[in-house]
Amino acid sequence: MEKTQQQLIHEIEHIRKFLIDLGEDYPLHSHIVVSCSQKLDLLLNEFERTKE
């Protein structure tokens, strides 16, 4: 099943929220959370740019 761009954006935002919650639970690993969140931000920005 192929997902629409809007579905992918929604899933990425859900993953980001999960990562943030995980970072709060495990502060020693917050650098991993920050790195993953930044990569997801770049992906979201790319989706937004290609949507226009």
From Swiss-Prot:
InterPro entries: HLH_DNA-bd_sf (IPR036638), Spo0E-like (IPR018540), Spo0E-like_sf (IPR037208)
A Pfam family reported for this protein in Swiss-Prot or TrEMBL: SpoOE-like
Disulphides: none
Alphabetized GO MF terms: protein dimerization activity
UniProt superkingdom: Bacteria
Annotated GO biological process: regulation of sporulation
Name the record gives this protein: Uncharacterized protein BH0262
Organism: Halalkalibacterium halodurans (strain ATCC BAA-125 / DSM 18197 / FERM 7344 / JCM 9153 / C-125) (Bacillus halodurans)
Lineage: Bacteria, Bacillati, Bacillota, Bacilli, Bacillales
